[in-house]
Amino acid sequence: MERLIDVASYPVLPVLDKLLQNKSTKKNIIWATDTYASFGNGFQDTDQIDRTLLLQHADVIRPRIRKSMEDQAQRTRKKAEVFTPAWVCNEMNNVCDEDWFHRKNVFNTPQEDHSWIPTEGKIELPKRKRWQRYVDSRRLEITCGEAPYLCSRYDASTGERIEPLNSRIGIVDRKLRIVNENTKTREEWVKWAVRALDASYGYEYQGDNVLIARVNLFLTFIDYYKDRWGEIPPGKLLRKIANRIAWNIWQMDGLKDIVPTGKPYEEFHQMTFGELFSLDWEEAERKMEEAAAIPAVIYHWRSKISVLFRKVKEKTMGKKLFDFVIGNPPYNEDFGKSGNNGKYAKPIYHRFMDAAYSIAPKVELIHPARFLFNAGSTPKEWNEKMLNSSQFKVLEYEANSARVFSNTDIKGGVVISYFDRNASYKPIGTFTTFPELNSILKKVKSLSDTFVSSIVSGRGIYKLSDKALKEHPEIIDIQSKGHKKDVGPGALNKLEHIVFFDNLPNDDNKYVQFLGLKEGKRSYCWTREDYQDVPDSFYKYKIFIPKANGSGALGEVLSTPLIGEPLIGATETFLSIGMFDDFLEAANCLKYIKSKFTRVMLGILKITQDNTKTKWNYVPMQDFTPSSDIDWSQSVHDIDLQLYQKYGLDDVRGQ
């Protein structure tokens, strides 16, 4: 198999020392991953990448697609790596160029099969724009990994080489094509090829990725030089290029703007009394050195100055350094850091989005889409901010993430978004997956005052009583910390023979039934009424429906909703809908919930398996009594037809 990256061979080997430099620390970049820890000293998470040690194991530096499946899975989970296919990078880079050239498909034309046809002939420039301005446009790929947006020697998701050169789709590839087509002498070509690199930036957390990205840019420059001049560049030029790349592809924690593994930046460390009089001065100095995290430094080539990256976020610098930011940010923290026994991964992509908006006027990113439906775990206030922003819009939405990132399930899909600081777009407001849903929602809202969410229970409406805890204090040890009164999804199993019983006990206490899951199956168990704190709906008819249901596909059938009779409660596995005086009203509500109309309206916000109260915000409330404008005695199909007529809708059979 062809080696895409070989740090031990010419022409990389002579400049490897340059490509390993960290300009912020004036040392080498560090590994910042434990993937290679088994090789011993020098390969640990915080170790610098030493040239001599690296060359003893040079074959470990290879694209992620060439790593073992185990390593890929570990890095995807632990470091939130999702590598972007070339066709996605191409389409996103095309948007960036559409903004500059004021026309679509400048360098190539994407095809339905995700291939692309390169533009033949010389690239035509817009009137009153010089090609040098395009080369000098400063573009940053955040969390760049192997730098697939910047250069495209190969497809990062498949490992396949991209040839010939005019088929390549990276930012630097496009700039070097423009340089090729508009320069005549070697001196002029070198000048502008160097400037193309000067204006192309990327940062990355993990040291192996930083090195691979740098090597990819370095070899990309050589490819274009050889294609134009028929030979490899001279050694002096190669070292100049390697040095520039070491500046422009830097190692950084993108949320803290510091060199990885450092603590938050501290400009001055106040020595403690103990440190001041400690006999172990070396230890005290080591602690001081660790306490002061090193801020990332980048270089402004036109101004010929280095600057702290965090200064770029200040308004005095923000509009001067980057014209455009692009990329695929990490989606979540390491699962092990976010709680819930490693089953929950806290989202962080929204923080990278905000950071990108602070350093460039235009930003294009691909990331999870759940926030568009006010779902997921991103802060609700942040969701609202984005949905109501006049500077933010959606370019493309894909509900099935596996169509973009193979074998990757991202609940709620993924979206390519675009931010323009100077734009005035119509705010998204309510995002719908299909254009037809916008008109349906508009009609329904115009004829509706209340919605089903107003009668859907929130989580935790059933609680264990103080009496249950007093008579059985062992419950506190059995329950999760901070949830001693919860009647959670596993309550029928966890509290069996204490609170819940399969068979009705033969004693003088009053017992009621609870619906829940036992060994994965729906079950009814008996519980003492005085062991439960219950809502008013407990004494009425209601509908029970699973809190988690399906995948989020529009219009999907709900998992067997059922009527809960009076004196029947439920664990947190189920939502409770309504509080009806008689069985007929509950039966009518059940028919409504089963209707296609309801399922489509529910699907506007329910884009994952999560089926919470807020997902019902756009399902209009109905009168379920015999005096209703809907004849509930009809079949569910005929009820659908009545609902379509009521709201002036075409049959939503196609939804």
Feature annotation, model-predicted:
Residues 75, 82, 87, 96, ...:
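C-terminal substrate-recognition regions of SAM-dependent nucleic acid methyltransferases
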Residues 2-394, 400-404, 413, 420-427:
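SAM-dependent methyltransferase catalytic region
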